[in-house]
Structures are given as structure tokens and as C-alpha cells.
Amino acid sequence: MFRLISFCWVLLLANPSQGQDINVLLKEASNFERVQKENEALEKYKLVLTQDPVNIKALVKSAELSASIGGRQGDKNNKRLFYETALAYAKRAWQADSNHADAAYAMAMISGRMTDIETENKQIVAYVKDIKSYSDKALSINPDHGKANYTLGKWHYEMVTLSGLKKAAVKLFYGGLPSGDLEKAISFMEKCKTLEPYFALNYLDLAKAYKEARQPAKAIEVLNKLVKLPVRTGDDPAIKAEGAKMLEAIQ
């Protein structure tokens, strides 16, 4: 018995608590994100998931980072691979805890990304519906979830401005176009701006919504703030550049 107890103590000393290891990995991942090393951050979150497969933070972050990295891929097949991987992480988060606002947001976020690569009309419409339903779910859990406010605002904006094949598909399979509302788009994205003041993509799409609403002064105000934002993610340089180009065109 004494030998068994001694052996157990050796194992405990050799392997620090799983929770401590996970906290260290999460901190390291966050540090990589702060310096825009998204691939390295993603690998750290994956390591967390090897120890805790239902860790919501790691699953949601893995979904976000996979989507972000995928969005910058020039090759369509690589983009699809990253997006489908992001969708798998989001689904795991949702299955782990469907009452977690971050899990619902992750499903809404990646559903939006999937509409950009999906070619089957019925599936495009299914993703469009999912953006709305999962955003609504996230906000029913936490009305102050910044990125869920953005995602729902973007959904309203896109329902107003849909064009081309995506518009035709939504009209055909949705039973008419959903009731997008430009005022709601602006309201949700303005709330996100308050809750997530460094989320560059929200500024860009909010400016587009103001432009669509024929409020150029408001669009210019938002764009002026966007171009002054610090770079926080790998997507930010391109977002800020697009904002600067849009600002030049409006002024």
C-alpha cells in the first residue's frame, strides 16, 4: 500500500494539475493573439482541446482563428478546408453547451463565412437562416455580447443589400427575402462598437450601413475612427486599408 501511495505522489509531482496546464496554454494562446501570431495561437488552443475536448473558450477561439486564417487564403480549396474546420469547432462548442452565448455566436459567425464558399442554393439559405437564429440565441443569453450584436447587424445589412446569385437563392428557397432592416443593422453594430471598441470589422460594416442609409457624415465619422484603430488581428490591416479607401471615396 505504501508503495502504491508513493507511486501516486510521483505521478502527481511529475504531472502538474490539468487545470493549471490548461490555464498556462490559454494564456500562451492569448499572448500569441496579441501579437497577431494566429497560427501559433491556434496550435495552443488545439493543445488545450487535447486535454479538455469540451473547453468552450478553446473551441470558440479555434473556430474564430480558423475562420480568420481561412479568410486570407488565396486558394479556394484551402479556404474551404479552414472554414469547414471552423464549423466543426463551432459545432463542438454548441454541442458542449448550447446555453453558452459564445457557442451560439461561433455558430452564427461561421455560418456567415460558409455562405461565401457554398455553391448549393438550399445550403446557402440554411446558413442564412442559421446566422439569424444563432445570433438571436446568443443575444437571448447575453444581450451585451458584442460580436453577436455585430453578426446580427451584418445579417440585417446583407438582407437589405443582397444581390446576384445569393439573392436569387434566398428568394427562391426562403419563401421571399427575409425582412432585413437597415436601422436595426445600424443599431446592432453601434452597440457592438460600444461593447467591442477595437473590433475593426464592425466599424467597416457600420460605415457601409450608414452609406447605404444615405448618411455619409456618419459613415465618415466611423471610418475616421477605423483608420486610427490599433492593429489587433491578422485581418485588421486589410480592413483598415479598405476603410481608408472608402473614406477617400466618400470625402
Task: State what each model feature region is.
Residues 17-71:
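N-terminal leader/linker segments that initiate helical-solenoid repeat arrays
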